[in-house]
């Protein structure tokens, strides 16, 4: 039985991928997540007998039970291309988010029994940040802590979900259990399109844009295009893939679809105007969950606003599962 801790847990996407790969051979013994709404979604789906810890900077390593695997999707905002690019200097609401990686390392190394594996996920821009120095610092810190790290950028669309989402994945093995070489998973070759993950009709009319709002979006796009900016909404082909879903501004509008199927006619839209004649709508939270590879039995218990943020911040579960299967092979061989 392998024991795991889930840091920066979000709604549990990384844990879910490892649970799927390891089956009954893994047990999560500690969870940390700062955001309270995310904690609620996590607790709904993982009914652990212990409380979720909050601010990781306040966690003492000695208070964390022994574990074999550390899962850490440390906040990507500090390294995001769309963000401020401040990296380790980023200070958000008084907390240096970029340095939270070092809290992961602190919890893993300030203990007698250090974990066998540290697994991290971050934005694809990490290797480019600060001319490569940010990633160099992360890898160097892992090496100094007696770990052998490997990293690779993988795209979610290569692992059975219709989302063009590139992320960097770092796998670091403790030296005494490290293989001579670690192979990241290859694309599975299964093509899925947006049409495959749509919810059954009828779709609530609240997801359909009003004609007034679409006109506003068009004017915004024209204004930004005239300035040479790339701002704007995007309508995705149902036979294609979505762009990377994100939690920031315009995240939903960059993945609009045309859905001519029946929709409920309840007048629930809060935007002035009538439902647009082109049947353009936002994707639903459940469809976003499917874009990330969450199974339909994964509960989405909160309001849409929270769910879009949580799913945009989460990970693509099938990618995590594929990497976790490779990690399990190494650990099983070293037993």
Tell what function each PLM region has.
Residues 16-20, 44, 106-110, 140, ...:
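Short, well-ordered alpha-helices that flank and scaffold nucleotide-derived cofactor binding pockets
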Residues 213-335:
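C-terminal target-recognition/interaction regions appended to catalytic cores
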Residues 3-5, 68:
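Conserved beta-strand elements of the Class I
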Residues 37-41, 78, 100:
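Conserved short alpha-helix immediately C-terminal to the canonical SAM/SAH-binding motif I
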Residues 59-69, 79-251:
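Class I S-adenosyl-L-methionine
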Residues 5-58:
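SAM cofactor-binding core of SAM-dependent methyltransferases
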């Amino acid at each position: 039985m392998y024991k795991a801790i889930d840091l920066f847990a979000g709604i549990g996407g990384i844990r879910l991928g490892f649970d799927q790969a390891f089956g009954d051979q893994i047990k999560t013994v500690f969870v940390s997540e700062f955001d309270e709404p995310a904690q609620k979604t996590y607790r709904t789906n993982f009914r652990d007998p212990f409380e979720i810890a909050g601010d990781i900077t306040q966690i003492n390593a000695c208070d964390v039970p022994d574990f074999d695997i550390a899962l850490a999707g440390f906040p990507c905002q500090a390294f995001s291309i769309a963000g401020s690019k401040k990296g380790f200097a980023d200070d958000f609401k008084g907390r240096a988010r970029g340095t939270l990686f070092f809290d992961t390392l602190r919890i893993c190394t300030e203990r007698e029994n250090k974990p066998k594996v540290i697994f991290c996920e971050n934005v694809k821009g990490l290797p480019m940040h600060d001319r490569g120095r940010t990633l160099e610092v992360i890898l160097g810190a892992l090496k100094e802590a007696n770990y052998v790290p490997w990293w690779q950028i993988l795209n979610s669309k290569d692992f059975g979900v219709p989302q063009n989402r590139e992320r960097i994945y770092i796998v670091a093995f403790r030296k005494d259990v490290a293989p001579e070489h670690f192979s990241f998973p290859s694309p599975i070759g299964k093509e899925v399109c947006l049409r495959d993950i749509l919810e059954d009709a009828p779709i609530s009319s609240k997801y359909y844009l009003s004609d007034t709002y679409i006109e506003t979006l068009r004017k915004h796009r024209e204004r930004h295009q005239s300035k040479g900016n790339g701002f704007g909404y995007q309508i995705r082909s149902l036979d294609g893939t979505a762009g990377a879903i994100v939690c920031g501004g315009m995240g939903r509008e960059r993945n609009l679809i045309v859905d001519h199927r029946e929709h409920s006619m309840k007048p629930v839209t809060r935007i002035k105007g009538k439902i647009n004649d082109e049947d353009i709508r936002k994707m639903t939270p459940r469809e976003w969950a499917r874009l990330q590879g969450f199974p339909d039995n994964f509960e989405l218990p909160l309001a849409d606003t929270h769910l879009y943020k949580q799913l945009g911040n989460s990970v693509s579960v099938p990618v995590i599962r594929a990497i976790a299967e490779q990690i399990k092979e190494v650990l099983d061989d070293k037993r």
